[in-house]
Amino acid sequence: MNGPHDLGGMMGFGAIAPEANEPLFHAPWEKRAMAISLAMGATRQWNIDMSRHAREKIPPGDYWSLSYYEIWIEGLLRLMNERHMLDGPPKALPRLEAQNVTPVLAKGSAYNRDVAPAPQFKIGDRVRVRNLQPTGHT
């Protein structure tokens, strides 16, 4: 998938100039956006890959006009809409109780996956690559 979220693979944008002493949050609402995203993740209605894909599906014109945390909220809204969580009566979902937030975040979550076949190449092998521009998720 080649889109605005893939700046590392897009031509013509130049180097990213990091903001000196950039704060983690530029405004109070950004803290809440992050907290809501984490809280909704605790409902176990999607995984980290589904969450990332929801953000990657944002149309480029919309994506370019959104800030970092607006992108997270837009992705969250997409996930919730896909699961009909915003219409009809509230559904009973798993919750993360306040006293458990810090230990759960400190523990993190699994992101490793077993790889069934052995890798085809090893470090130092010469390979030939193609510049593909896939339209879907890779």
Locate each region found by the language model.
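N-terminal intrinsically disordered, low-complexity, charge/repeat-rich segments that act as generic
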Residues: 1-96
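Mixed-charge, Lys/Arg-rich low-complexity intrinsically disordered regions
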Residues: 89-138
